[in-house]
Amino acid sequence: MVLSSSCTTVPHLSSLAVVQLGPWSSRIKKKTDAVAVPAAAGRWRARARAQDTSESAAVAKGSSLTPIVRTDAESRRTRWPTDDDDAEPLVDEIRAMLTSMSDGDISVSAYDTAWVGLVPRLDGGEGPQFPAAVRWIRNNQLPDGSWGDAALFSAYDRLINTLACVVTLTRWSLEPEMRGRGLSFLGRNMWKLATEDEESMPIGFELAFPSLIELAKSLGVHDFPYDHQALQAIYSSREIKVKRIPKEVMHTVPTSILHSLEGMPGLDWARLLKLQSSDGSFLFSPAATAYALMNTGDDRCFSYIDRTVKKFNGGVPNVYPVDLFEHIWAVDRLERLGISRYFQKEIEQCMDYVNRHWTEDGICWARNSDVKEVDDTAMAFRLLRLHGYSVSPDVFKNFEKDGEFFAFVGQSNQAVTGMYNLNRASQISFPGEDVLHRAGPFSYEFLRRKQAEGALRDKWIISKDLPGEVVYTLDFPWYGNLPRVEARDYLEQYGGGDDVWIGKTLYRMPLVNNDVYLELARMDFNHCQALHQLEWQGLKKWYTENRLMDFGVAQEDALRAYFLAAASVYEPCRAAERLAWARAAILANAVSTHLRNSPSFRERLEHSLRCRPSEETDGSWFNSSSGSDAVLVKAVLRLTDSLAREAQPIHGGDPEDIHKLLRSAWAEWVREKADAADSVCNGSSAVEQEGSRMVHDKQTCLLLARMIEISAGRAAGEAASEDGDRRIIQLTGSICDSLKQKMLVSQDPEKNEEMMSHVDDELKLRIREFVQYLLRLGEKKTGSSETRQTFLSIVKSCYYAAHCPPHVVDRHISRVIFEPVSAAK
């Protein structure tokens, strides 16, 4: 089961100036606007403002009640959001990216290319075996004399790339001027090693850089600062690391050390060749494999290098392939940016690919690896489980030792991103999955400790706002994460093409981090937001016309109710579901209050709900009364009538049947609310009331689910066909009741910590069971995934509301509903 919307219409978006200069990695976009607000979105915002200013006048004139969605005529005029071609090129381009995935699109590493260029002809002749690699070096020196990532300066990266290229050119007595400029750069910048952040040190730098220095010295490279003070710390680190390398182990079983063999002395190649990866590489490292080829002449090493050189037109990346890494991380980015609905087929293909290469021991960045690591394993586990694949959490036992979790099998260190993705994986645990129940607290405490230390940096990536990503996930776990809140934050955390990964050198993954995803996501968000603003204007009119302020529902309550709906069901094509949720939630709050205050109200409302749509106006009371009972009864009946009219074209059949579904849902809710021992609101403080209006009880949550489902053309809860479906409905109600109870307990100073802990434990168990039923039914492909998504959205919104302080909710409302996303990166 894919827990995402099937709504895939392409939005009407503003034009984007794009220049295509070759492959994805060289895509350049022209940015001219300060704020990425589509022209159409701007028009809708202007219209929303105009509607807002004329609202009171319209009400004064006795205008007809606001419809649940726009009329057919209005929809034809606006054609929201399907008929503009501006988004099509972006969607098509991303689709082409996703379908082009193979072994991974990755930038070239000058360091690794230099090692490949050092391989002499294997037939004993003079010159390099791979002259194309040497050509690449000659063609890619930067203006300052260095080699490396041109857009981001890192002393580690530039120094190791530059020294490697100088060594290779010296080995073949080529380009003395280039070598001189490279050596000049090294001399000018060596001091910067002492100022670099250790977290950004490339993989194996303390081993590889001294090895290159020794190689340079053996080749007679002059003018290199061999005794520079900044090198002393690197030499010391090398001695410590060399002593720690388990030489016997590294020759016996595959370990991550295989990735960094180049320049390492005292290797037993006969034994190491038995540890080659299936593609002939040494843990997918061109540099390590080139070094092995120099020392062994192995045919499989040659084949791997030869294929890679040809693939990248002379250069080679720092690691290859990166197929699993690319497939997994691209899906994650698209989902968090809120644009995955456009690419459901392509995402399904990506996840099928990952599932084919999943193993019970885990995975790493490339298929068929004998070495596994927790970062890719955790990301793949989470996505596979969420997309309906059966995966066992026992895989994480491979990364656990003495109650701690680590990055690679056999190691004992952690990285921020590895623990971050482990924590995300633990959030979708099932009952009894003890390893995930241990991984969750361990990773949470590790990350919170790093946060307190101001150390949420990672050795694998230099991203725009990794601390923001981590803190958001810790504050809003998966079962309390509203999609549009996440997308709004991630749009400011995702750096697009500016995000850089750290391997042996800096590298880029253009199908994971690129500006095309970012541009479409910004446009989509702003476009949906403009529609949401227009809907809110209509909802305010409806709120005023029905006098809901007279029943204790403030306009702020109405806005919060709409926000929960819009942040959960945000797609333009799901306006009917979104507005049904919001209006039902607002009206339910008003009715709940009036049921307690008016003894006669229940009987009158139930009587009216039992009548046929044409009968309720026959009674003299209904026609003549303008009291509070009549006002609220009319509001409920008008809502059910509006929902029925909008849902009839979707359902088909007899409109009377839809009315019956809607009215019976409300009648059942009224009966249960009136009969329940409702101690929640009695004696509540103002603060408690504010929260209680957002956190619904079981009866109201199930009412909202039925309103959403009927508006979507389904009828959740009327006749659940599977035991699992029925259990999901039961658990939804139970979780919502527990959340309501938790909120009230937390606000009562007389309640003790033991009671709060008991409520938390019960809630945790119910959520795990809910997640299990939800995702296991997805694995079986039974029932309606859309209906399960409805219940998930209801649970998430209640969890969010119960745990999120009011001032944070209000900030999210502002960002999600009212503040457009800026184009500034």
Curated annotation (Swiss-Prot):
It catalyses: (2E,6E,10E)-geranylgeranyl diphosphate = ent-copalyl diphosphate. It comes from the Eukaryota. GO terms for molecular function: ent-copalyl diphosphate synthase activity; isomerase activity; magnesium ion binding; terpene synthase activity. Expressed in tassels. Induction: Induced by the fungal pathogens Fusarium graminearum and Fusarium verticillioides. Keywords: Chloroplast, Isomerase, Magnesium, Metal-binding, Plant defense, Plastid, Transit peptide. Its EC number is 5.5.1.13. GO terms for biological process: defense response; diterpene phytoalexin biosynthetic process; diterpenoid biosynthetic process; gibberellin biosynthetic process. It is an enzyme of class 5 (isomerase). Its cofactor is Mg(2+). It is found in: Plastid, Chloroplast. It holds the Pfam family Terpene_synth. GO terms for cellular component: chloroplast. A motif (DXDD motif) lies at residues 373-376. Residues 1-70 form a transit peptide. InterPro entries: Isoprenoid_synthase_dom_sf, Terpene_synth_N, Terpene_synth_N_sf, Terpene_synthase-like, Terpenoid_cyclase/PrenylTrfase. Pathway: Plant hormone biosynthesis; gibberellin biosynthesis. The Asp-Xaa-Asp-Asp (DXDD) motif is important for the catalytic activity through binding to Mg(2+). Belongs to the terpene synthase family. Tpsc subfamily. Involved in gibberellin biosynthesis. Catalyzes the conversion of geranylgeranyl diphosphate to the gibberellin precursor ent-copalyl diphosphate (ent-CPP). Involved in the production of antifungal dolabralexin phytoalexins in response to biotic and abiotic stresses. In response to fungal infection and in associtation with KSL4, is involved in the production dolabradiene, a type of antifungal phytoalexin. This is Ent-copalyl diphosphate synthase 2, chloroplastic. The lineage of its organism: Eukaryota, Viridiplantae, Streptophyta, Embryophyta, Tracheophyta. The gene is CPPS2.
